[in-house]
């Protein structure tokens, strides 16, 4: 095991593919901590770590980064982001990945429990809501210390599409997407706005039509699939990486950001013992609060359909 001179927080990234490599790079850019990049492909992890390290004199960022295939190197990590798993190919749904990726998550969870039981764990592997529950069950970590990255990404996609349609800065748009990370996610139109002006009011002002909003909702639901079909040999990684790092930053620096994430519900929204996308506050204690919104009858119906789909998917893990 290689010794590290820990200058700050220790962050372990399990999986050094496109998302894992990009997360490692973003962590260095933002100086969030020292990075252990772990992958069963030892050469890939070490190669990407070295490449990122060699960029540090240009980017003027400090801290350690190294690649490994040894789980002992994640010992006492403060935070862990899991991206390992097979990715979608054209024609595949996220759900097609279940059996293979559950076995991968099981091995990872066992090693996290052994070497870093106090870490805050962010799961990115798809199908997200299934994998984060598998992580919880096999690692036995407290539920407040495990979350899934989904809603941040879905909300970002929705915000981007709205911004492009209205020809406004993406910085002006706030949006919120709940439910499962898939075709039955729930973009909450009434909680989405442009510089404080609700989407409903923008429709009344004639700046966007209801049909166009509906079209954007559907495109958001198919956002990952759209990128998979274009890339043909992989799935999205820039936006997922940014999303995971935003969550990580909120935890490490106790920012207490309210973010839509897949969190363990114990009766909130009428759901028990499942990870579902809802607004949460992430701080130094992990998931510090689950924000329970009052949904309309229509919203609740879509949300419950999303929950039912997740329940079916997790039945055999």
UniProtKB/Swiss-Prot annotation:
Binding of substrate, residues: 88, 94, 126, 157
The keyword Thylakoid is annotated on this UniProt entry: no
GO term, biological process aspect, one: lactate metabolic process
InterPro entries tied to this protein: L-lactate/malate_DH (IPR001557), Lactate/malate_DH_C (IPR022383), Lactate/malate_DH_N (IPR001236), Lactate_DH/Glyco_Ohase_4_C (IPR015955), Malate_DH_type3 (IPR011275), NAD(P)-bd_dom_sf (IPR036291)
Key words, A-Z: NAD, Oxidoreductase, Tricarboxylic acid cycle
tRNA-binding is among the record's keywords: no
Residues binding NAD(+): 15-20, 39, 101, 124-126
Active site: 181 (proton acceptor)
EC number of this enzyme: 1.1.1.37
Catalytic reaction equation(s): (S)-malate + NAD(+) = oxaloacetate + NADH + H(+)
GO molecular function: L-lactate dehydrogenase activity; L-malate dehydrogenase (NAD+) activity
Function noted in UniProt: Catalyzes the reversible oxidation of malate to oxaloacetate.
NCBIfam families according to UniProt: MalateDH_bact (TIGR01763), PRK06223.1 (NF004863)
Matches recorded under HAMAP family: Malate_dehydrog_3 (MF_00487)
Family as reported in the entry's similarity comment: Belongs to the LDH/MDH superfamily. MDH type 3 family.
Protein name according to UniProt: Malate dehydrogenase
Organism (species): Ehrlichia ruminantium (strain Gardel)
């Amino acid at each position: 095991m290689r010794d590290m001179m820990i200058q700050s927080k220790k962050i372990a990234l399990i999986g050094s593919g496109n998302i894992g490599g990009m997360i490692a790079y973003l962590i260095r850019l933002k100086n969030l901590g020292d990075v252990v990049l772990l992958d069963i492909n030892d050469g890939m992890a070490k190669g990407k770590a070295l490449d990122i390290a060699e960029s540090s004199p240009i980017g003027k960022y400090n801290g350690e980064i190294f690649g490994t295939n040894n789980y002992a190197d994640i010992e006492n990590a403060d935070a862990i982001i899991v991206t390992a798993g097979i990715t979608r190919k054209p024609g595949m749904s996220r759900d097609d990945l279940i059996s293979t990726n559950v076995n991968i998550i099981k091995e990872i969870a066992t090693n996290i429990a052994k070497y870093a039981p106090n870490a805050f764990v962010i799961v990115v592997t798809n199908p997200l809501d299934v994998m984060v529950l598998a992580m919880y069950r096999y690692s036995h970590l407290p539920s407040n210390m495990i979350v899934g990255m989904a809603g941040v990404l879905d909300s970002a996609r929705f915000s981007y599409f709205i911004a492009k349609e209205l020809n406004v800065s993406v910085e002006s748009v706030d949006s919120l997407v709940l439910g499962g990370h898939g075709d039955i996610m729930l973009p909450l139109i009434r909680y989405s706005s442009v510089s404080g002006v609700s989407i409903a009011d923008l429709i009344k002002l004639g700046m966007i039509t209801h049909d166009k909003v509906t079209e954007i909702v559907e495109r958001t639901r198919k956002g990952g699939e759209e990128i998979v079909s274009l890339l043909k040999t992989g799935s999205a990684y820039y936006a997922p990486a940014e999303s995971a790092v935003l969550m990580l930053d909120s935890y490490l620096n106790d920012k207490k950001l309210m973010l839509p994430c897949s969190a363990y519900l114990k009766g909130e929204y009428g759901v028990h013992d499942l990870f579902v996308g809802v607004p949460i506050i992430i701080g130094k204690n992990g998931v510090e609060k689950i924000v329970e919104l009052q949904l309309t009858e229509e919203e609740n119906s879509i949300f419950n359909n999303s929950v039912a789909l997740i329940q079916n998917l997790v039945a055999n893990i």
